[in-house]
Regions:
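Bacterial N-terminal signal peptides that target proteins for export
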Residues: 1-7
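Short amphipathic alpha-helical "recognition" segments used for binding
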Residues: 7-9, 110
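Gram-negative bacterial Sec-dependent N-terminal signal peptides
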Residues: 10-14
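C-terminal motif of bacterial Sec signal peptides marking the signal peptidase cleavage site
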Residues: 17-19
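Short, well-ordered alpha-helical
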Residues: 21-124, 155-156
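Short glycine/serine-rich loop/turn segments
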Residues: 65, 98-190
Length: 190
């Protein structure tokens, strides 16, 4: 084999290997820790908007279509908040502790931007003027409240998650079972 052919074959192999290594894998936040998510954000592997969109898409794909019914309401301002946090990241300013971490809160926590029913149809039009103390702390720390989860009416049942406002929540791993109790929506949402 001539030197030219050997050189050409070697060059093609090296270029092929290099192109395989340079392909960027799609980052997947499922089962990621807060630190892993924030590292991916800081390294530019994902934007805050992309992250929130992934979680909203997962809710749309898995919750109602699969009969889980863990989510009661989606925060219509979640992507807008994500855009603001993307701008904060670009600015180089210091980032809050829970920067861009998507959070789902139980429907008995007041949120100024979503209905709070406590699982009861009686409160179907209850839009609190302020956040609950802990929700405010989460937002101040940079978390994005993306949705609220179903709960047993008035947080009363230790056995199953059924509310007059949003119905029954099933176990995310097997819808023939219940996630149990007043926080079942949160359990299945996770």
């Amino acid at each position: 084999m001539s030197r030219f052919k050997l050189f050409s074959i070697t060059l093609v192999i090296l270029l092929t290997l290099n192109s395989c290594q340079s392909r960027q894998t799609i980052w997947n936040p499922v089962e990621s820790t807060i630190n892993e998510i924030q590292d991916a954000l800081i390294l530019g592997e994902i934007t805050c908007r992309n992250l929130v969109s992934i979680y909203l898409q997962r809710i749309e794909t898995y919750d109602k279509p699969n009969g889980i019914n863990a989510i009661t309401v989606i925060n219509s301002q979640a992507l807008e908040k994500a855009d603001k946090l993307d701008r904060l990241l670009e600015s180089g300013d210091s980032l809050p502790e829970l920067f861009c971490i998507p959070i789902i809160v139980k429907d008995n926590f007041d949120t100024h931007d979503m209905v709070t029913t406590g699982g009861s149809v009686v409160l179907r039009d209850s839009y609190p003027p302020d956040d609950a103390f802990m929700v405010g702390k989460l937002r101040d720390a940079g978390a994005i409240i993306i949705a609220k989860s179903n709960m047993a009416e008035w947080a009363f049942s230790p056995r199953e998650t059924v509310s007059s406002s949003f119905g029954r929540t099933a176990n995310a791993y097997d819808i023939n079972f219940v996630p149990a109790g007043s926080s079942g929506g949160t359990a299945s949402a996770v």
